[in-house]
């Protein structure tokens, strides 16, 4: 079977990381052929990586967020016909944007919403998003695995961080460390707990202090592994929560616990909390966060198994799910 894997762009964020894994293990585990399809109308920072591993086809058409993409659909139908594609997989927001080719099986994999069913299979990226929309549609998890499993180095010496320091880190979208009530207790705890450091990768600055260290974004998986290795835990503070969080997963697979808001506001997605359950530290407000950070020590963070992803989200488990749901 020949499967086309489509994304709206070949960017450097989690969507394309997941796309690459599905395409990779579609070949290695399911024994199918994978082809990558995307657009040349947007930046393609990961194009070389995809071209190294798969036949990669770029089309010039521009996707329109209007619910109608007839020109793009025609282009994709020609590619499907010329390449002998059996199934067209698209990782997407979840809206029916009417671009998927109609001359093969259409597989829609939804990241953010599941209220506009379309295609031959309409599935979410996790149980949480399926349940959020009534549980009527299936789901296929993202593959979570430890990148660069042999990498055990960290950045403490390079950054001048003492071995006995407690380092809380985070990475993700630059503007998604945005739960505003956390800033004051975080700074207050930093001033009281002299062993506390914050290490932020690709994160907008909110306070200047010698023990708050900012690093630029990197696509290098080994550098990201060294960054996570430097940390004792992840400090999570995203205003709208998580449907499925790859950033928290990257910490958990290296056995680093997550500190996150136990929010119940209507806007707050609790997908990450449903995954972690009791394998995380939670705060309900600024006071709880301050007490947690002021009193945090290595004994509370080490010696436990924080990896909640090792079985259900493995390549074999997920690709078997992929086969059952999509194929």
What are these regions (language model features)?
Residues 7-13, 21, 25-70, 204:
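N-terminal strand-loop element at the rim of the active site
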Residues 66-72, 203-204, 212-228:
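Conserved active-site histidine-acidic residue motif and adjacent donor-binding/catalytic loop
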Residues 225, 248-253, 267:
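Short alpha-helical segment that forms part of, or immediately flanks, the ligand-binding pocket
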Residues 257-264:
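Short hydrophobic beta-strand element within catalytic cores of glycosyltransferases
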Residues 84-85, 226-243, 256:
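Acidic donor-binding loop of glycosyltransferase active sites
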């Amino acid at each position: 079977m020949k499967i086309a894997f489509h994304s709206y762009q070949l960017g450097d964020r989690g969507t394309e990381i997941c796309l690459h894994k599905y395409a990779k293990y579609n070949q290695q585990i399911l024994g199918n052929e994978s082809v990558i399809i995307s657009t040349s109308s947007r930046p393609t920072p990961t194009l070389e990586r995809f071209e190294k591993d798969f036949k990669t086809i770029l089309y010039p058409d521009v996707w329109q967020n209007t619910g109608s993409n007839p020109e793009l659909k025609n282009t994709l139908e020609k590619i499907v016909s010329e390449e002998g594609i059996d199934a067209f997989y698209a990782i997407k927001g979840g809206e029916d944007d009417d671009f998927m080719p109609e001359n093969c099986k259409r597989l829609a994999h939804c990241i953010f919403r599941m209220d506009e069913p379309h295609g031959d299979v309409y599935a979410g990226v996790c149980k949480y998003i399926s349940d959020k929309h009534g549980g009527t549609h299936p789901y296929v998890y993202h593959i979570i695995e430890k990148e660069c499993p042999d990498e055990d180095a960290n950045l403490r010496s390079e950054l001048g961080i003492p071995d006995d320091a407690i380092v809380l880190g985070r990475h993700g979208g630059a503007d998604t460390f945005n739960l505003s009530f956390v800033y004051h207790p975080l700074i207050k705890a930093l001033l009281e707990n002299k062993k506390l450091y914050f290490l932020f990768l690709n994160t907008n600055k909110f306070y200047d202090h010698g023990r708050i260290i900012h690093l630029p974004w990197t696509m290098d998986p080994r550098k990201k592994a060294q960054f996570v290795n430097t940390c004792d835990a992840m400090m999570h503070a995203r205003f709208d929560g998580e449907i499925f969080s790859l950033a928290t997963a990257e910490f958990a697979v290296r056995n680093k616990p997550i500190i996150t808001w136990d929010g119940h506001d209507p806007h707050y997605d609790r997908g990450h909390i449903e995954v972690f359950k009791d394998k995380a530290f939670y705060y309900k407000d600024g006071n709880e966060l301050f007490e947690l950070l002021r009193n945090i020590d290595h004994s509370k963070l080490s010696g436990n198994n924080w990896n909640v992803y090792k079985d259900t989200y493995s390549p074999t488990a997920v690709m078997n799910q992929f086969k059952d749901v999509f194929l």
